[in-house]
């Protein structure tokens, strides 16, 4: 079983106050965000508490799989028997009330022989399983080709017309930041405008050794860029 022991944040009232100041334009701390190291030092579990949880897990026979820098999670792997013994539960299979399957879950709330506070232990049950929500169109399905793009496809400008109508709002003087987990090809962005011009500058901000290129699987990144530029054509820049 793959579990995650979740530890609580410290100084939560101070954190709530900091969040207000970070997003208050009148505050000297406006948008002065903390680094991971700064956040961990001020609000994360202490190194001593985190080490205690790691020691506890290993003493119960678990393998510690991952230790994030913010010290909020201790990822562990172990058997059901180890889970039963460590957390004073009995892992049991139950019939799902609404689905034709069984699911596993402990017979009671877990408890730990540990002085360090723990918020939650994730992975103790599979009652809910993530599933794709897409639906396959029937073979005789026909779509209305009413967009302004090739073969009636929708362009970003069509989305602006549909949602904004004749409004004068263009996003003038503002910037949009897009967090993407892969690169993109500029040629794909250009092609997505289908001959329409894009006047919004696109600036790449590469972090942690990332590169701007793509192996071709850049549909999500390109869509995000095109939609932002089309919905707000007066933007001063898009930072990707």
Tell me the role of every PLM-derived stretch:
Residues 1-69, 75-76, 80-240:
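Substrate-binding/charge-relay-adjacent region of secreted/lumenal peptidase catalytic domains
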